[in-house]
Amino acid sequence: LCNAGSRKDGESMQDALPSVSVVVPIYNVERYFPQCLEALCSQTLRDLEIVAVNDGSTDGSLSVLQEWARKDERIVIVDKPNSGYGASMNCGIEAARGAYIGIVEPDDFPERDMFKRLLRMAQRHDCDLVKCNFFEHYEDRDDRIRNFADFPYGRLFDPVEQPRIVCTIPAVWTGLYRKAW
């Protein structure tokens, strides 16, 4: 279903350090989580690790995750007893091996080039943090709502000089963060 990414002969994805690790907290999301996994496995950035943290789900979320992990070795499963969102995120970040961390909620469906574009900007300008816009889509509507359309995209800015940009898009899942930061 998804290619494992490029690596040297005999080297598994577990040996090669990815550029980006995407942490996904999971708790009882069996119904819509496969669409999120499809979006992550279809990313144009192949040098990607998907760290899925199962927070003691009581539905079939873990089974869905295990099935996907058999198809794509970039998926790393962290299975733990339920301890809440914050603890799950901390476990995922600790397990992540990438130089940059992305966060995706299980009901998010990132566009195919999201992480490639964010990583390119982060590397080109040596950024600790890169943010992006997002669309909202509701099951009962056909349209997508673009948030923050008037913001300056594709430009560098100092968050001290323009704090409204960081404060207005505070969602952790709209960015890429240098792990060492």
Positions of PLM-derived features:
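Nucleotide-sugar donor-binding/catalytic module of glycosyltransferases
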Residues: 4-6, 11-181
